[in-house]
C-alpha cells in the first residue's frame, strides 16, 4: 500500500506534531486589542477555553452568548488552525448575516495568518476579500453572506462552516438546510446573540442535546469585564428594585454587575 504524502510544505514534521494541539498553534497568533490599539498575543480567557474544548469534541455546536466575549474570534482562530493542519484541499466557510459582517470576520482570518511568524506563513495561492487559500494544500477559508442571493452556498462543499449571528439571518431554515447539505458530516458551528423568541435558533437551543446539537451557553454575568463601579448609593440614583434584588440573589451577582446591567438597559 502506498504511503500518503503529506503535502504541507516547509513546516517541519515535529512542528506539525506539536500543532495537533490547537493551543500550541494559538501561541503564535496575535489579535488586535481595542484598549491598547495594538496587536497582542492571543490568550484565551475562560469562555474561549470552554468553547475550544467543545469544538474539539462535538460536530454540531450552537452557542448562546453575550456580546463581545470573543467567541467569534476563537472560532476564526480554530478554523485557521483546521485549514493549516489539513493536508487536503478542504474548505472552511464563514457565513454571516451581512457582507460587512462576513468581511470583518474574514479580515480576522487574514490578521491571524499575517501575525504568524514568517516561517509559518505558508505561501498563499489566493488572498482576496472573500478567500484565503494555502498554496501547497489548497485548504481555504472562504466567506459568504446570508443576505445575498438565495442558495448562494449550494454550489460549494464545506469541510466545516461557521454561522455567525445566525439569529439575525433572514431565512434561518433555508440557509441551515443548505449548509448541512454542503457540509455533510463536517463540523457546523452556530454562534450568535439571541434575537427573536420562537425562531429556529431558539428551537435548536431548546432541543439540545437530543437534537444532536451541543449547546455552549455563556451568560453575560460570567464574563469578567461586564461590571462597573456601583452607583446605587448615590443620592439621585434609584435603589435596586425587588426584581433586581431577586436577580442578584438568584445568580449570586455583585452590585457592580447589577449596575452594569442597569446601565446597559438604560442605554
Describe each model-derived feature in a short phrase.
Residues 2-267:
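Phosphate/NTP-binding elements of NTP-utilizing enzymes
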